[in-house]
């Protein structure tokens, strides 16, 4: 499944993740709210701007969602969507990326440099609260800034999109398909 989960390019000014479901790329709407998602795939960078989304819903009321969906011709995954209603106690899996920055000191200010890369993070989650199309999860790993837009899976299908949280608190997710 992790081959279908992507992070925003290092060339981007902001962070976020998303996943490919069939020919659709799905992320959190707030990830593309301030600027495009730069998707590095197949040796090229695709620019996904919110104006090009086939579905863009950034409404945090219970019947809203925090989801952006883009059609990506030429790319395909075997992932499917799970349209079940979230219920407290449901067990989920998470896959996201964490951006790692490492500063390397040199002898002079001119020889100092930074190295950046992404590290994949996989874990489990349990739904603890449901409010319309949104749900909270306790996770087995600490998800950092930049994990927004990552998928949460139930039985190998994309069940929702991570959209927020603070360290030590439950993670907030949005259903991909609104009621």
Placement of each model-derived feature along the sequence:
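Terminal helix/beta-alpha structural elements that buttress the NAD(P)+-binding lobe
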Residues: 137
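Serine endopeptidase catalytic core focused on the charge-relay Asp
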Residues: 2-7, 12-14, 19-24, 29-131, ...
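C-terminal cap/linker of serine protease catalytic domains
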Residues: 100, 158-179
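Catalytic nucleophile loop of clan PA
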Residues: 19, 140-163
